[in-house]
Regions:
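Basic, polyanion-binding surface patches
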Residues: 1-214
């Protein structure tokens, strides 16, 4: 519903922190990429990112936008991707909400979130970084392209586009080539500290240009 009164906000006046709050509170719901990587020294890393989406099916690609830390430095996920050119986007099922959230803490460099939160690294099919064994779906990716957004200060990000080279899926979560949402139980990110669940689903027929509008 609308009050009829519209406010115009200038990003320059709102500022970086204010715009971040508007983005996470207005772009809803956001799917969560539970990204696993590995450093050149062999240390695994696991972190959730909600600036994430599908890009293309030919070639099959996903995108994850990785913001800088508050001091402007790069996160371990980005450092690992730049070093190895590989990563895995694991699904974010509701039953892993607590562990997923725990992985968002800023652990010291060289510490594996797999070990800290008690998740199981499983061997991937075509990339070196492990997938999360507890997740029913994983997209194994090789780096396709990175795009720097901003000047590298707080709020800047690197848009990472990954080409999917393999998909790992629990057989209970797929039927006739279609993924089953009730088996995936996807978690989504909302504004502030809030998360969401996909509980109510409805279908609409795909319209044609000749079908009457209602």
């Amino acid at each position: 519903m609308s009050s009829g009164k519209i406010l115009t906000l200038d990003p320059n006046e709102v500022g970086q922190v204010g715009m971040y709050k508007l983005l996470i509170g207005g772009v809803l719901p956001r799917p969560i990429a539970f990204v696993s990587t590995i450093s050149s020294e062999g240390v695994t890393n696991l972190a959730p990112f909600s600036f994430f989406n599908a890009v293309s099916s030919n070639p099959p690609c996903l995108s994850v936008s990785i913001t800088r830390k508050n001091d402007g430095s790069k996160k371990d996920t980005l450092r690992n991707i730049e070093a190895t050119h590989q990563f895995v986007v694991n699904s974010s099922p509701a039953w892993l909400a607590e562990k997923l959230n725990a992985c968002s803490a800023e652990f010291p460099h060289g510490v594996s979130e797999f070990e800290k939160v008690g998740l199981t690294p499983a061997e991937s099919a075509r990339v070196r970084p492990p997938r999360v064994a507890e997740c029913p779906l994983a997209f194994e990716c090789e780096l396709y392209e990175t795009v720097e957004i901003g000047d590298g200060s707080q709020g800047s990000s690197t848009l990472v586009i990954g080409k999917i080279v393999a998909v790992q899926v629990d057989e209970s979560a797929i039927r006739d080539g279609k993924l089953l949402i009730d088996q995936l139980e996807p978690l989504s990110r909302l504004g502030g500290l809030s998360y969401g669940l996909t509980r109510e689903i409805f279908d609409l027929p795909r319209p044609s240009a000749n079908s009457p509008s209602r």
